[in-house]
Structures are given as C-alpha cells and as structure tokens.
Amino acid sequence: MRRIVYNISEIEPYINWLYFYHAWGLSGKPRAEKEKLKAEALDMLHSWEGEYHTYAVFGLFEANSEGDDIWLEGQKVRFPMLRQQHPAAQGEPNLCLADFIRPLSSGITDRLGIFCTTVDGGLEKKYRSDDYLNMMAQTLCDRLAEATAEKLHEEVRRSIWGYAPDEQLSIEDQHQERYQGIRPAIGYPSLPDTSANFIIDQLIDMSQVGIRLTTSGMMTPHASVSGLMFAHPKARYFELGQIGDDQLRDYAQRRGVPVQAMKTYLQSSLIKK
C-alpha cells in the first residue's frame, strides 16, 4: 500500500485543460477567451504551492476472475462487476471489466490496482464568500484530482507495479490513453455503481487521505477520484450501457445488497420499462 503526497507544481503539467474549458462552457469558444481564463486559473494554482497538496493511495492486489466477479486477496474479497447487455457494435463481445483479469480456472494469479486521489479539503471551502473564485477553485480542484490520477497511473505503470518500465509517453499521449492498460473510475461508464466505493474503502482505507463516503458511496471532498487499474494489453474502456432487471438482481445478490438499494445506485443504468 502506498500513500503519496504531491506538490501542486508536480501535478500541474498533467492537467487536461480541455475539461476545464468544458466545465466553464468554453468548448468551441475563441482561443483568447480560453487563454484569459487559464491565466487566471494558473495564478490561483500557483498561489496554492507549498500550502496545499494533492494525495493518492494505491494498493496492488493479487486477483483472479470468476464469471463477472473479481476475487482479491486469495478469494477473501469479492468485487462484482457488471456486463454489457448490448454490445457497442454488431459482432463485438459484451464486455465486463472482469474479462481483463486472468480466470481462477487458469491457475495463474493476476493483479489488480486499486486507487484513490484527492485534494486538500480546505481548498473547497477557501473561496466560499466569492461565487466566481469559488467556482474557479472547484473546477481547478476537480482537474487536480484527475491529474493526480494521471500522474499516479504513470508511476504505477513505470515503477510501482512496473508492467511497462520502458514506457516513454508524453502527457498528451497519456491524455489520449495511449498507454498499456486502463484506469476506469467509479461513477464512470464502465463502473457506474458508486456504492463500489465501499469495497475500495475496505481495501485501501480512503480516510488516510481525508476522503469520506456518503451513504450512497459518493466521496467528499467532491474533488476526488477512485477506481481500478488493469494491466492487460488488450484492456480497453467501454460504456456499460443499460442493464435489465435480471442482471440487476444477480448483481445485487453478488454484492450482498438489497435489490431496491441497488436500483437507487444504478438508476441511470437500468433499462426503462
């Protein structure tokens, strides 16, 4: 298990400004508008150096898959996954993240990375008396949490896990996801169930970097990211899409969660009747 503290200046190069502009409604707007906002953002960012930091926790676990489940720590921890019920394109398989972990029947132990990243909680409260500065700080914090995940993933591939020690990718290449493996985050298209954060918390104790979970598995500070890291060379991102009542019930049973509660967690992923 690793807990890492980063200076703001270490993370700044990894920020994907396209998403920052999108958050401000500047996608497709003139470059001058974007550059003006970015200059203001950088001034704020640089004022945080030394006083505030970003944080990461990473754990590397022995893992094997069995059906749509990933088993960790010698089959002590079950991490159920969801499978596409409608492939993205005709002839494509219905994907599940468990597909990218060696099956238990192979007799070969695989590995799975589990992580979380966040920012100093004080940053989200620092500018509450000024709506504009508060929005600037919040959107910057969101980008910092994502950029910290990007830098952590680079370090994991090259050295911590070390499955791609000779990787030489620019940050732009990394933003284009040209690396080996994937880093799906909780709440994103292939992992929509926020309550999966309770399993992640059980494994890596997110409280050690100040992350707390709500009853639905949402994280505070808001500017936090959690998820999984897969090393399989053919692992790829995909969108789960909508699932039927049959898979909902099966998944709830595997998670040990009442079906009604799981319906709440997966509301946006359920096929509408």
Q: What residue spans do the PLM features occupy?
A:
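Active-site loops and adjacent core secondary-structure elements that bind or stabilize anionic groups
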Residues: 1-134, 139
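Extended, compositionally biased alpha-helical segments that mediate assembly or anchoring
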Residues: 267-273
